[in-house]
């Protein structure tokens, strides 16, 4: 059976499982505080994750949201960490190192990655496995290596070697039965609220006038006449709320927010409204517009009339709160950033062009 798992994208360094005992982030490059490495979730709902591997030197307070367990055997809190492709534990009671198992011994590294669940947003669960098996959405450290534990503490599940390996009092121990860290992706609803637009960063672009319709008023008589020309056109506008992360696709989504008006001299925001949307996708709206104009047409002339509209585009940064509701009733909320993108219509008018003689008209 093909397993659906979490894939770790490590951006700062390239780790291999061949020689993890030589790995150290105590290098000049690693100490430059590399960016957190996001964990990409490879699952049918295709969501980005709030899980991150954050570089940490073990000094000061443990990062907010660090993933931990209570180690009942040692009577302490252990945090999930990794040295290269080997996950293990960090504890405030054992010094500023990450402890991991490799080559039948317990090893440590003093610069390491610690697993952080920002805002405790991801619904993490420990699920059972054995003989190298891992459940759906298991947190992967490297290819075929996953975060695991048993009653003795944290370690790594290596599917190739069909066991959990963990450090214990200076030695490496392995077990055929274990638990694997997973992400619950059974989301049934997500809501975007508390949207705050950064209007000072909004710079709408006024596009050149666009001709939507053409018509004309003609007069074959020998006296001026007055005609009313009406033009009608269905015009499509677009808007989207693109969120940088945490969106779960394929589930019920809604947003409660004001709508920016970008088709004016000053950008303003309407009162809040609730919409059912597909976050990250563009929502379109089609509205039929009608304009009319009275034209005085000289004898034996025709006067072209055009329907002209001016469209505005803008990208506006925003912040907000994303709330997920799971099938089991749990709710998780996180802060998010994103960009509101819109195409709106401003002025719509009828333009009367210069009148011309009707070719071949009978002289008056």
From Swiss-Prot:
Presence of keyword Hydrolase: yes
Protein's name according to its UniProt entry: Natterin-3
Superkingdom of source: Eukaryota
Post-translational modification, as annotated: Contains 4 disulfide bonds.
Regulation: Inhibited by tissue-kallikrein inhibitor TKI and trasylol. Plasma kallikrein inhibitor PKSI527 and classical inhibitors of serine-, metallo-, thiol- or aspartate-peptidases evokes a minor inhibition of the peptide digestion.
Sorted UniProt keywords: Disulfide bond, Hydrolase, Secreted, Signal, Toxin
Location in or out of the cell: Secreted
Tissue distribution of the protein: Expressed by the venom gland.
Keyword Disulfide bond on entry: yes
Function: Shows nociceptive, edema-inducing and kininogenase activity with release of kallidin from low molecular weight kininogen. The cleavage occurs at Met-Lys bonds.
Propeptide, residue positions: 19-42
Enzyme superclass (EC): hydrolase
GO CC terms in record: extracellular region
Family: Belongs to the natterin family.
GO molecular function terms noted in the UniProt entry: hydrolase activity; toxin activity
